[in-house]
Amino acid sequence: MTVDDRTLDTLTGEVVDLLQTLIRNECVNDGTPESGHETRNADVLRTVIEGPSVEVETLKVLPGRDSIVARLPGTDPHAPALMLMGHTDVVPVSPDGWKVDPFGGERIGNEIWGRGAVDMLNVTSSMAVTFRHIASSNRRYPGDIIYFGVADEEAGGGYGAKQLVRDRWDVLECDYVLTEYGGSPVVTNDGISVLLTTAEKGVCAQRIVVSGEPGHGSMPYRTDNAISKAAEIVRRIEDYDPGPRIDKLFESRIKGQGFDAELEAKLLDPGRVVEALAEMEPGLARNLHSCCHTSFSPNLISGGTKHNTIPDRVELTVDIRILPGETVHDAQQHLRDAIGPELMGSTEIEAIHDQTATESSTDSPLWSALTDAIQMTYPGARVLPSMVTGGTDARFFRERGVPSYGAGLLSADISLGEFMNRFHGHNERIDIESLRLTTKLWLDVLDRLWN
């Protein structure tokens, strides 16, 4: 639905107000069942999107952790349905690192500050305002439009999309999904590239149990100390290199970044990519390294019973993110290779998560609609597929064969590196122009999808 500038200004103002409210509701998800309190945001979103032509259903998994879904019926029952999906929870903060109240939702200049401003209450808000605008205008498209405001994305979706896609497909059924994250314009010598998400790495966290022999802490000589062995295992995992994989998705990402020819050549060479990354800005280097490697991060360790007792058991949790095409068995074999046979004799490996990587093809009407819509704002822009190294709720839909893309459209004032650093970081914020462009994107996509 094409709108004039005045209408877009009004909608943007509504997005700003809604975003501020969602931030102030402080729906912090620390991973425990009793956290999140997403019902606060679900109730607000309900008041925004419900109306005479819209029925909103509350989806309950746990008390206080509501999700909501609403469907705007299309005119053609055979036309594909599009879901606009945004999560309503945010991650915890360290207040001492913030310049402002992280849950104040303050407007400072042309930016809205607060936890969730980029992850992803900005998108959740713009989608809700877009959905309400379409419903109130009485404009109908061939296919259904679904709004899904979902809880618990930040802790894996067990109380949100993961369970609801499994148990409530009757209300969530769709043919396409738009969600986080994407839309950063990258200025290159050849013009502008805009990266959208078509894939995400798999999560294969593993628990490593290291065994030893107990003894008195005053006599450590020639003892079998489980902590000492665990420390060596951590060192070996840190040093382990599974080798890079330069696939078409990574190649597309590199060619769209606008690097100079020499750096681009290094990044696309398996023998030189790590050398090239070592010379780059750390934030971008970390992201690109993870996009072409299976990654291993030892993040939790526990063991020992008393200061004077040699420990006989240590548990170590390693966050492993695998590339498309790899399995949990591949992840465990990497660990065995890293640890080595002499230490594997006193080590057990157990899978905690077994989530394979997911990827959607760009050969779809929705991708074409996104490309056309983005080029209305950034004429001639190359719209390129990319992979996120973390997880989103899109994976649960991709597993059902539903093409799912992470989208949005940011202003040129936010670099890709800065945008990535704001996720889960201090002083999270979004500029109002990006809220305007993202809202316009949804409207432009809807005008093009069924054409």
Where do the language-model regions lie?
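N-terminal helical capping/dimerization or prosegment-like subdomains
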Residues: 2-95, 313-317, 328-332
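Short beta-strand segments
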Residues: 85-87, 149, 178-180, 209-211, ...
